[in-house]
Every structure is written in C-alpha cells, then in structure tokens.
From Swiss-Prot:
PANTHER family (alphabetical): DNA REPAIR PROTEIN RADC, UPF0758 PROTEIN YEES-RELATED
Gene Ontology MF, one: metallopeptidase activity
Top-rank taxon, per record: Bacteria
Binding-site positions, Zn(2+): 174, 176, 187
Keyword Metal-binding included in the entry's annotation: yes
NCBIfam families recorded: PRK00024.1, radc
Domain MPN: 103-225
Sequence similarity: Belongs to the UPF0758 family.
Name of the molecule in the record: UPF0758 protein spr0996
Keyword presence, Ribosomal protein: no
GO biological process, one term: proteolysis
C-alpha cells in the first residue's frame, strides 16, 4: 500500500489559493477549480490544459458559444454552462469597474472601449451611454439586440433612461457585425431622430458611434449631423 503525500510546491489549486492567494495560481489551476472534476479518460488538470491549448488567448473564452465550449474535450453541457456563466460574470465585473465614473474625453477613446465590448458580437447591439455634466458615464443601457434590418431605435426609450438617470448628455453606440463601419441610410435616419428628440428635452447627443472589431465611425468626427 502506497501513501500519497503532496510537497509544498504541489498543493492542490484550492489549497494553494487559500494559502497563497488567487494571484499565485496559473491559468490552468484557475480553470481546473472552475471545472472541478475530470473524466475517466483525463484528469481535471489535463482537461484544463487541453482547453487552454485550444485558445490563441484567454479572450477567446469570452467569444465562445455554449456549443463551442461543449465541443472541447472533457467539457459537457453542465460544465459549459457553468464556464459561460463565470466568464460573463467576470466580464460584467470588468465592465462595471471601467464604467464607474469614467470620463469621456474623445470619440476615439470611447470607440476603443466599445470595440472591446461589441466588436465581436454576431448580432447588432444598440447601446446608449448616459453622462453627467462632467462627461462621466453614469449609466449604460442596451436598447436593442437584433439583426441589422430590424435594428430600429426608438427615441422615446432612449430618452426614458436619460431622464431616469438625470443625464445631461448621451452617446449612441452600435456595432456592425459585417465589420464594415460605413453608416447606412437607416443609421443616418436614427441619428437625426434621436438628435431632434434630445434637443426637445434639453439633452445633448454627443456622438453616435459605429464599431467593428478593428474600426469605428464617429458621426461627430465625420459628419455634420451632430
């Protein structure tokens, strides 16, 4: 009968986390904690490493669908759901941290931030950012998610959140899943409608941004509509 002993430098991930702090753990160890168990064919550490080997970077995990996660060796439906929930929670925490009282100094700065959030979305998302008198973001609201042809903005809904959060200005942002950021006639129409509605309420439409993974279009920079 053999007894198994662990050396100080080979503590199980949960024990290492408790002893040394979460920052001390490798990506493999963190993922192993989330996966919890292995299979008959592979240990949880082997599965974690296989998952990481399938990624070009950790950000790929955020982009993966439930089906894509399940296609990875050793990842069943339950593990895939749990992983996606954890990834989304981490994303929301990060978004909240960067959102809190962030001052908007330029369209380029804001576009870069929203590219990270919307650039890889496969459906069109229309988002409104609401600002105070110091041009600090006080609220972010997704107005619409859908196909390009169905993405019709309703000024009344956009202004509802502006009034609710006592915003003095707002920025519209939406993505083009195709990757091309040139505005459509519908984009121009929506921009005009929202600007007119904002003016009636004494709210400033600072910009309307169109973003893709690698590019952006600013109505304020490129047109005279704003």
């Amino acid at each position: 009968m053999y007894s198994i002993s662990f050396q100080e430098d080979s503590l199980l991930p949960r024990e290492r986390l408790a002893k040394e702090g979460v920052e001390a753990l490798s990506n493999q160890e963190l993922l192993a904690i989330l996966l919890r168990t292995g299979t008959r064919q592979a240990s949880v550490f082997e599965i974690a490493q296989k998952v990481l080997n399938n990624l070009s970077s950790l950000t790929d995990l955020k982009k993966m669908t439930l089906q894509e996660l399940q296609s990875l060796s050793g990842i069943g439906r339950v593990k895939a759901i749990e992983l996606q929930a954890m990834i989304e929670l981490g994303h929301r925490i990060h978004k909240h941290e960067t959102l809190e009282m962030e001052s908007i100094l330029s369209s380029q700065k804001l576009a870069k931030k929203m590219q990270q959030e919307l650039g890889d979305k496969k459906q069109e998302h229309l988002v409104a950012l609401y600002l105070n008198t110091q041009n600090q973001i006080i609220h972010q609201q997704t107005i619409f998610i859908g196909s390009v042809t169905r993405s019709i903005a309703e000024p009344r809904e956009i202004l509802h959140y502006a009034i609710k959060h006592m915003a003095t200005s707002l920025v519209l942002v939406h993505n083009h899943p195709s990757g091309a950021v040139a505005p459509s006639q519908n984009d121009d129409h929506v921009t005009k409608l929202v600007k007119e509605a904002c003016e009636l309420m004494g709210i400033v439409l600072l910009d309307h941004l169109i973003v893709s993974h690698s590019n952006y279009f600013s109505y304020r920079e490129k047109t005279d509509l704003i």
